[in-house]
Amino acid sequence: MSKIPYNHKAIEKKWREKWEENPVNVQYDENGNKKEKYYCLYMFPYPSGNGLHVGHWRGYVISDVWSRYKLQQGYYIIHTMGWDAFGLPAENYAIKMGVHPEISTAANIKNIKRQINEIAALYDWDREVNTTDPNFYKWTQWIFVKMFKEGLAYEKEFPINWCPSCKTGLANEEVVGGKCERCGAEVTKKNLRQWMLKITKYADRLLNDLDKLDWPEKVKKMQADWIGKSYGAEVDFPVEGRDEKITVYTTRPDTLYGATFMVLAPEHELAKSLANDETREAVEQYIYDASMKSNVDRMQDKEKTGVFTGSYAINPINGAKVPIWLSDYVLADYGTGAIMCVPAHDDRDFEFATKFNIPIIQVIAKDGKEIENMTEAYTDAVGTMINSGEWNGQESSVLKKEAPHIIEERGIGRATVNFKLRDWVFSRQRYWGEPIPIVHCPKCGNVPVPEEELPLRLPEVESYEPTGTGESPLAAIDEWVNCKCPQCGADAKRETNTMPQWAGSSWYFLRYVDNHNDKELVSREKADEMLPVDMYIGGVEHAVLHLLYSRFYTKFLYDIGVVDFDEPFHKLFNQGMITGKNGIKMSKSKGNVVSPDDLVRDYGCDSLRMYELFVGPPELDAEWDDRGIDGVNRFLKRVWNLVMDSKDADITATKEMIKERHKLVYDVTTRLESFILNTVISAFMEHNNKLLEIAKKEGGIDKETLSTMAVLLSPFAPHVAEELWEELGHTESVFKAGWPKYDENAMKDDEIKVPVQINGKTKAVIEISADASKEEALAAGKEAIADKLTGNVIKEIYVPKKIINIVMK
C-alpha cells in the first residue's frame, strides 16, 4: 500500500492552477508548426435557474473526453462553451421568480459557469458566446435581414399553434403530442400576423444531403420523415355555379374516378363563402369549434366530424358533382388545405362517407373483381382499375406513375412534388428575444433596418410579462416603436414581435471561432481554417428542431458566400438521459435532482467524470445510483497505489507486462473509437486488476506500462493522470505524450486454452502453444483424453486456437 494516499482535492487544485498557467491545448507545436484543428462541440445550454445536476454532466464529460482524446492525437482542439439565453426557458424562469430576465439570466450563467468549471473540461473561455449579447445578436439580426432581402423571410396572417400558458405562437416542431414542448400546456390555434422563414425552399437539399452525414440513422430518419417528400398531382376541381376552383394535392391521382366528395380544412379561404343560407350558421359554428382544437386533437383516430357547405364541385375527370364538406381532420397547412376523398380506398374517407351517407365507388380491385357491399376500405396499393372509364383494366401501380402526366396533358392539374415540411413560424409575442429588424412604413411597406445600424437593441422595460393579446410587450413602448422609415423618412413603426429561442442557436457554432469580430459574422479565413464542426454532441430531442434549423441556416450562409460548406456538423452523437430512480426524469419539482457539487467535494471530479461514463451505454438512458461512484473512486485509488508502489522500483518489463500493456491500449482505443465508453471504464478496471496480480509476482510494474496507463487515463481522469505522469518522472504535461499505439503481435498469447471434445462434447481443456501445428495439437488433445478413447476414431479435427474434436464410433 502506498504511503502517500490519493488526495483528490489537493491533486485537482494543483493541476487546475498549472493548466491555467500553461494551457495544454495550443495551436502551434514546439517547432512553430500549426496543428490540424479538430472542432468538438456540445450543444450549449439554456442558463436554467436550477443549475446543473448529474444528468447534465454526462454530455459535457463525453464531449471533453473526446476532445482530450483528439488532443492526445496531436490536434488543436476547438472546444467551446456559451449560453442559449434568449427565449421562453429564460423568460418563463424570470417571470416565475419575479426578476427581470436580464438579471436572472446573468445570475444563472454565473452559477452554471462555476459548476461547469468543476468538470475541468478543456474549454476555451476566450471563445465564449451569449445569444443575448448585442454583439452576438447583431449577427442573428443580420442573417434575418439577408434572408428578407433574398425573399426567405415574409409576413403572413394565418392560424398558428398558440400556447395559452406561454402566451405565444409556436412552430410545428415545438408542439409535441398536442402540447407545448416547453411548458406542457395544451396547444390551441390563433389567427395572428406572423413572420415566416421559407425553409421549404431548402426541403430537397435538406433531404438529399442527409446522405452526406455521419449521423445516427434514427436522427436522419426523423428528419427525412419530418420533411416528408411525396410525389403526386395537384388537381383542379371547378366549383359548380362559380368562377372558382379548388385545388387538391393527391399522391393517388389514379383513383380520381373514385372521388365522390371533397373535404376542406375549416381554415380554407373558401370555407365560409361556400356556405348558403341553409348551411351558413352550421358552417360558421364548425369553423369556430375547429379553431379551438390543436392539430393533434384533430388528427386523432376518433369519430370524424364534419359539415356540408351546401356547395358542389365538379370532378374534372368525369364531370360528376361532388359535395364539398368541411372537416377538422384536414389541416390548412398541409398540401392545399383541401382533399379529394376516395372512400373505397382510404380508411378515414370510408368512415366519413359511411357516417354521412356519401356514395362509395370502388376503382381498384384485386384481380379486377368488385367487392359487393364493402364493409371497409380496400387499401391495397395494387390491383386492376375498374369503374374508371378509359383507365379500366390498367394496373394501378403503373397508372399511379402515369396519371399525373395524363392529368397535366388534359389541363386539369399538374404533376407535383409535395413536402410535409412547413415554413417556419419565426415570430414570438414575447419580450425576451432578438428584436426583428423590420420597420413597417405606410408608404414603403416592410423595410429592413440598415445593416450598418445593427444591432437593433432590445429596449429595457418594466413590464415584460406576455400580454396574451397577440401583441408583444414591446408594442407598449411608444418611444421605441415609433420611428422613421429608413427608406423614405416618413413616420413608421418598428416590428414588435421577437425572434424564437432557436434564432441564435441555429448559427452560434460559427461564431465561436471568430467571436470578437465586429465587422463580419465570421471571417472567411477563420471559417476556412476552423469550420465546420467535426463532432457534435447533444440530445436526440433536438432532431427536428435545432438540428434541422442549423442545417437550413448553414445552407443559406453557404449560398450567400459566408462559408464554403453547406452542412454544419460532420458527425453527431446523441447521448441518453440520466434519470432518477425508476427512470423518472430529474427535476426540482420531483425532488429527485442529484447535485454534482457534493459528489465532487467527496469523491473528486475525476471519479465523477468516470462514473458518468460507467453508468451505462452513452447513447441510452441510465438510472443514477450514488453507490456506483464509490466503486469508481476505489478503482482510481488502486491505480494510484499501483503506480506509487512501483514508481521507484527498478522493474524490467516482462513479456506478460508488455502483452498486458498492448492489450490495455487496444481495448481502450477500440472501445473509445466505437463510443462504447462504459466499456472503456470496465477495460481499465479489468486490466488494472491484471496488473496488480502481475505486480504481486514481479514486485512491481515497469515504468513504460505505468506511463501508458497514465496517458490512457488522461481524457477520462485528467488530474490524477497528470499527477501519476509527474510521479513517474516526466517533466512535461501528460497531454504532450501522444496517444499510445498497440502492436497486435505483442498481444498474442504464448499459451492458449483449447477445449478437447469427443463427438462434440467437451471432455477436457488443455493449454498448448499458440503456434502449435495441427499434429502437435491433436497429439496433446488425445493424450489428455486417452482414458476416454474407447471406440474407433473416425475423424480428428483441429480448428486452430479454437477447438479439438475427436469423432468416434
PLM segments and residue spans:
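Conserved oxyanion/phosphate-binding beta-strand-loop segments in alpha/beta enzyme cores
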Residues: 1-41, 71-80, 104-111, 215, ...
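Helix-rich, typically C-terminal accessory recognition domains appended to large enzymatic cores
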Residues: 149-161, 415-444, 501, 566, ...
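Alpha-helical recognition segments enriched in aromatics with Gly/Pro capping
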Residues: 311-317, 321-334, 363, 481-618
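Residue patterns forming the tRNA-binding/recognition surfaces of aminoacyl-tRNA synthetases
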Residues: 5, 14, 18-22, 96-246, ...
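Basic, alpha-helical terminal appendages of large translation-related enzymes
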Residues: 1-22, 27-37, 265-268, 277-280, ...
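N-terminal catalytic cores of NTP/NDP-binding nucleotidyl/phosphoryl-transfer enzymes
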Residues: 30-99, 105, 128-143, 166, ...
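Catalytic alpha/beta core of large soluble enzyme barrels
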Residues: 63, 76, 268-367, 372, ...
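Amphipathic alpha-helical
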Residues: 200, 205-229, 265-307, 452-484, ...
